[in-house]
């Protein structure tokens, strides 16, 4: 029973917020490379369930983007997002931070 409480405390319901630049990046991937677009959706789903572990090698960012996290979309491109207690802000899905 104690284990159940720990699990429920770790998983929080957060609202996913998609910033305009992120939506534009997703549109780009749908038009240019649907395979990468599908991977982006997998990373969004994984990041929404557990923002700090899972697929895409999640890592905390430093310096100007301290507090943000990234997941590897391709060798060159990353999904960047901010996590708070109540929401996950998806900021970009192209380029590196």
Which residues does each predicted region cover?
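Enriched for short, Lys/Arg-rich terminal
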Residues: 1-15, 24-41, 55, 61, ...
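Short interaction-prone segments
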Residues: 65-67
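Solvent-exposed, amphipathic alpha-helical segments
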Residues: 43-46
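Blade/loop signatures of beta-propeller domains
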Residues: 49-50
């Amino acid at each position: 029973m104690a284990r159940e409480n720990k699990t429920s405390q770790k998983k929080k319901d957060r609202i996913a917020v998609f910033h305009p630049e992120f939506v534009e990046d997703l549109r780009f991937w749908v038009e240019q490379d649907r395979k990468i677009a599908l991977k982006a959706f997998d990373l969004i789903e994984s990041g929404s369930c557990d923002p700090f572990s899972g697929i895409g090698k999640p890592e905390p960012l430093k310096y100007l983007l301290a507090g943000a996290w990234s997941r590897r979309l391709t060798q060159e491109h990353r999904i960047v997002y901010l996590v708070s207690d109540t929401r996950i802000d998806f900021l970009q899905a192209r380029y590196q931070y």
